Amino acid sequence: MSDDFLWFEGIAFPNMGFRSETLRKVRDEFVIKDEDVIILTYPKSGTNWLIEILCLIHSNGDPKWIQSVPIWERSPWVETEMGYKLLSEEEGPRLFSSHLPIQLFPKSFFSSKAKVIYLMRNPRDVFVSGYFFWNSVKFVKKPKSWQQYFEWFCQGNVIYGSWFDHIHGWMPMREKKNFLLLSYEELKQDTRRTVEKICQFLGKTLEPEELNLILKNSSFQSMKENKMSNFSLLSVDFVEEKAQLLRKGISGDWKNHLTVAQAEAFDKLFQEKMTDLPRELFPWE
């Protein structure tokens, strides 16, 4: 088990699969192409679900690709050692993912036409999902208790830093033509309409039966049964034995876990931190 994080520019990262020098290269040297499509999220916000949907949009609903290539190769995380190497060698348009805050994201993006889809989620659910996820993997420092992780999360002393800072950093981009802001909650509530919105953003036309295939093959149950998407291929060096990295895939699970005192403290913190952003941005409020 790892007993500390890798720190880079004040942000915590796992100390397995990441290096400071690579993080610097990603920010300063990595070249984003105009044809690239990028999935941006804070961890535990529905990243893998969105990857699955985008892969299926690319294949018009045909599941062969998602059933034959691991999810981390179909849409590599650019900031990881493996992802940086894969993407640096890949020719043509690329699909890739990132959890990076805006100040560490590749500088080349801001003068490109590459399309970004930013998926956000109720931070209470992000917190709960993160607690179970980080306790299931071996490459990060683990909290001693639920309360300790709650304090870490509220302070931003967690992997990829503060949720509040991440949102604040990226939200000014939401009016740009090449930036699509989505929420996990709207994707869950009306998956069909949200997938149609993604297709419109990407300039992709689908037949009704292709859209139906995308919805079917990206369902939580389908992903849980697909060994290329459920992370069961990861070695025991990375995950605890019998860990389920796709846990529930629901909205509002925080109500089953947060104490009344924690919920009240979190509400107060949310109001303080997000007061300068329009409430309608957050469909869970």
From Swiss-Prot:
Record GO cellular component, one term: cytosol
Binding site for 3'-phosphoadenylyl sulfate: 44-49, 121, 129, 184, 218, 223, 247-249
Residues bearing PTM Phosphoserine: 251
Transmembrane segments: none
Organ and tissue specificity: Predominanly expressed in liver. Detected also in adrenal gland and in jejunum.
Similarity-based family: Belongs to the sulfotransferase 1 family.
The protein's name in its UniProt record: Sulfotransferase 2A1
UniProt gene name: SULT2A1
